[in-house]
Amino acid sequence: MSLVSQNSRRRRGGRANARRNNGKGHPAAVPGPDVPRDRNDPKILQGLRASEGPGTSMLPTPREGPSASVPPTASEGSSAPRQFIISQGPNTSEMPTSRKGRGASRPPAVSAGLNTAMSITASEGPNSPVPPTAPKGSKAYEHLPVSEGLAISEQRHSDGGPNMEPTLGEGPGISVPPTFSEESGISDEGLSIFMSPNISEGPGINEPYSVSEDPSTSVPPTDSNGLGINLPPTFGEGLSISMLFSALEEPDIFAPPPSAEGLFASMSPPSGEIQSSWVSPIIMEGCNVNVPPTSKKGLRTSVPSAACESPSTSAEGLSSSLSSISAEGFCSSLAPCAAEGSCELLPCGEGRSTSELHCLGEGSSTSQMSLAAEGPSASGMPTEANNPEEALSCCASERRNKSTSRALQKAKDPSVRPKREDRFLDFQVLRDSKNSNSITIMGLGTSRVALTLKPQDPMEQNVAELLQFLLLKDQTKYPIKESDMREFIDKDYRHQFPEILRRAAVHLECIFRFELKELDTEEHIYILLNKLGPVPFEGLEDVPNGPKMGLLMMILGHILLNGNQAREADIWEMLWRFGVQRERRLSVFGNVKRLLSVEFVWQRYLDYRPLTDCVPVEYEFYWGPRSRAETTKMKILKFMAKIYNKDPMDWPALYNEALEEDADRVVVNNFRVARPFRRPLFAEVAPELDASGSKYSPHSWPESRLESKARKLVQLFLLMDSTKLPIPKKGILYYIGRECTKVFPDLLNRAARTLNHVYGTELVVLDPRNHSYTLYNRREMEDTEEIMDSPNRPGNNFLMQVLSFIFIMGNHARESAVWAFLRGLGVQNGRKHVITCRYLSQRYLDSLRVPDSDPVQYDFVWGPRARLETSKMKALRYVARIHRKEPEDWPEQYREAMEDEANRAEAGRRPLIVRNLR
């Protein structure tokens, strides 16, 4: 054999021997990248490292794909730390085993002198560890850092129990805590959960509970020899729950609340001889509860829980403790703390709430306290309404011995008083078992306060909700469907809808002056009609502000019944009896306090005067000048008689006073009628007050200039009428020009005539001393002679004119003809379609397709709402007044209107059923 062949054979044999002698992971001469080179290599102390990307906390080899790595085991007497290697791919792991042991699933045999230090990093990927449990006497130090900067550590120390520093152990065993994945919620933005391994007697493998993504679960293990445990808080944005170990022999347990963006609570259990593990209820928003645990014999665990979606508060503010006693005598101690010094109590709803203590077997016992909510509440861990996740606590001493027994247990002490150095304010809340609305709050070290909640009838609450919905819906003038009304009634009371609707109709009729009328019995559509009729001058008849005007009439009536004056406290007491509260912002009335003391006073409906001889200062309300101009005492007296179900003559003195006022008004009206028709409404300026500096003399202004200034003045009055505020003379001159001072009476006369004939309003002097003016609507016909879609803006009211035009044209008019009519009234081209569409949706108009029309055309006719709210005679009178004619000038329409009035009078004698009016 040649020398070359011998050398090549030797090289091949050497490589084969090297492959047989070495492991499968690396070549013979190249060590692994994660294998320590010598004893001083810092990688020995690094422990198990996580890869940069999303990886798994397993024990694989550095090659790709699933693989297994079995590091060498320690022999007897060796003192070598173990190292676990993690690769980048999805791998599986096997725990290190001893070559002399029974199998790969058992912990390695470690002799005396073996010190093991391990740290496990939790990555973002899924983990599948099978941690063994440590036997009795084993000692281990465990550190669990979390990737992305979030670290969680558990340091275990106890006087008589095992020390967690790496020391010499008496028996073989390694305790590896469970790893954490995304599902368990250990991340910067997820749910932060503490989980710890079970320390039991003897070697074995303990598998932790699987944690899903939805429920937040914490599993506290127990130790038979007792542990003193201190857990630092975690930091995250979500729900943070920390569960403590339970011990037997007086452990000193402290758990600070986690610092997350949520509400945190910790509760101390009542002191006793029994073993219990407490789970505190989740506190609602704005409350931070922290109570130090008491120290007596028995197992005591303080478990802080947190609720998310609320800023975290600290315990630096004012704190108090609440000792809640249930019907069975169970009591607890809470200390709510607010960051800004506010003190809050646990929210208690309507109904009874029970508190139960669930006792487990010999190992541990768990008690759960439920949060008081509306209706009967069962015991269990409560959750916040906005967070669907459930907090589940489970405490088990040994997996083989799981015995659960549930019993209702009462605490021995009535309350648990916190330490005085914490500056807690102690209270006791006593709830009457017979009357759930009666609550007594007694301070343990302060004065006693007794509170009795006002009983609320669920039926009345549903009536109030339906009433507000009807009033809001009526402002849009749209028909109200029964299905929409049922949505505002609680599901448990929808079967009593007829009774609730009847009560709401009574309130509408008595207080808000509306009648609930069924428009269509088949489709169950309702509308609101004016029932009590408008006031004489119609100033208070403002449909969009109808509820406010009804409230004003009630106040005016109360002032009238109390001798034309009433104190503010008496008015609030009267309103409270009708369900109107000062502090509550109603959706219909808005801010009631501002409405009374600001808006009605500014609008001169009320006068608000202080009483000088009262300390503190009190105020009295009187009728304002606008109220005296727009209504009468007789009208208000009849209104109050309907509310109190009486007759106006039941108040004889007030009735005689109202009759005298009506007689005076008749004399004044007759005196005005006797005057010339073209009489100036306002006096002319005296000649001696004329100034020669004007460009034109008072009687030498051109007619066009006077008409221009009068139109501008009309625009000002219409603009200010929506605010109901008085218009001073100075403001008028500032708007139209100060050069109009000399011709001011003439301009007022022109503007008053335009407002009276065109817009149906009258210009009056509200305050002669301050020269302030205002508008009010005077309807010369019957009470509801005209209907208006926008009463507060007369310039936008074209409903009565459109209805009259349709009636004059033969009860139907083409769409193009109606638009041409609106264009003649000054309506812009872009708005005519909007106006007619609104009238169609409000059922004032109906559209009928013209047969054989190409392109398609429609005719407008009166709708059902128009036939209910007005009549043909009223429309004919309206047209006659506009054209300065008499209704008889249209003989055909007048005869039809008279027949319609006869039919209405006959229908008024029998019950009216509105059905298919189209």
Curated annotation (Swiss-Prot):
UniProt tissue specificity: Expressed in cell bodies and dendrites of hippocampal and Purkinje neurons. Also expressed in peripheral nerve, where it localizes to the perineurium and myelin (at protein level). Predominantly expressed in brain and at low levels in the heart, liver, kidney, spleen, testis, lung, thymus, placenta and skeletal muscle.
Ranges annotated as biased composition (Polar residues): 70-96, 113-126, 213-227
Extent of the signal sequence: none
Keyword Cytoplasm annotated: yes
Domain MAGE: 459-658, 706-897
Region feature Disordered, mapped onto this chain: 1-140, 154-227, 367-388
Name of the protein in question: Melanoma-associated antigen E1
Taxonomic source organism: Mus musculus
Gene: Magee1
